[in-house]
Amino acid sequence: MGGNVEAAKLVKKVTPAYPTIAQTAHITGTVVLRAVIAKDGRVQELRYVSGPALLMASAMQAVREWRYQPTELNGEPVEVDTTIQVVYSLG
């Protein structure tokens, strides 16, 4: 498949809440998610891949609200699969 592909650009990022139980237990790390970015730039088909289980729900909730400038192929919006990393750290 040839042509000019323009990658999706994040235009709205919602910071995930850090669950109190995870903070108290000093749990940090990166939650890795797989997503399909729809033609309109919305996140859809979000799946958990890896990372601390206590952080998964808050990461997924925040990422569902993210918005992207749609990916374009030859000037037309297309769906795209992507990997998203949400990093949690204390201090």
Positions of predicted regions on the chain:
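A short, well-structured alpha-helical segment
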Residues: 26-30, 38, 42-74
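Acidic, low-complexity proline/glycine/alanine-rich linker and hinge segments
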Residues: 1-24, 61-64
